[in-house]
């Protein structure tokens, strides 16, 4: 019988889950069980080669998590609103439900996470459940910004867990990932032509390299003596400060440009534009995590993670792929 502790990682081939897998594969005393929809993918096979146990489970099939979670000491759970939103098959499902696509994706993500939570609550060996969530924009803005669906969908599942599974929630930590630095490399909304968007450039935000930082932060969460709600980031800095760092590191002159509400550098359907407008407004007025007094920061954890800087992230990117050679 193995004396190692078992961490089960959902989304183990993605940004957040992949970082957690990478971290715990290097930790003596831990066995990694990587959960994925496609165990034969190259990323899944690479994890298996390095010693991870790769198992198949699907967020749309809650029963698949019963065997996947068996014997777990720690479970890291993550979902993907934007994956649902971008899946061509979702358009027909949203139409059949007579819902805008982003509303359908949010509702579906909430239901997926409820299934994960229900399954985790049945694991008697579990010592820590770590749920990747985000702040409830509608709640913390007192209803002023009700359309930040990709935040509230996760927060609703989090609330469900607290209300329906108090024993599980007594050993649950919440991980709120900051704004992904990778958005400045691969997201068409925020590629640095100049930064063009609706966000106040002087509002401070938490920035995270999710593919690098999630694992060390989750490790610190797991090692902490009690459950916490942690905002995950490597730096809290304004967009203006971020752009100054980008210019200093790359030598490329850059400046923020703020568009009026309702406008975007990329054309969106009205319902998504409204969501983004509410998103920028919420961050500007209430902050990334809404002023939730229960949130703690990575440096406040008992085993605070050592993370690289924003400058380090920018230095190693191939900006010719963004701007051309």
Predicted regions and their residues:
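Short, conserved SAM-binding segment of the class I
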Residues: 112-115, 119
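Oxidoreductase cofactor-interface core, primarily capturing Rossmann-like NAD(P)-dependent enzymes
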Residues: 2-31, 35-45, 60-63, 70, ...
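General small-molecule cofactor/ligand-binding pocket signal
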Residues: 33, 53-55, 173, 255-260
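Short, amphipathic alpha-helical "lid/cap" segments that border enzyme active or binding sites
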Residues: 66, 117, 211-219, 307-315
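Amphipathic terminal alpha-helices
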Residues: 298-325
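Terminal hydrophobic/aromatic helix or amphipathic segment near a protein terminus
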Residues: 50, 239-292
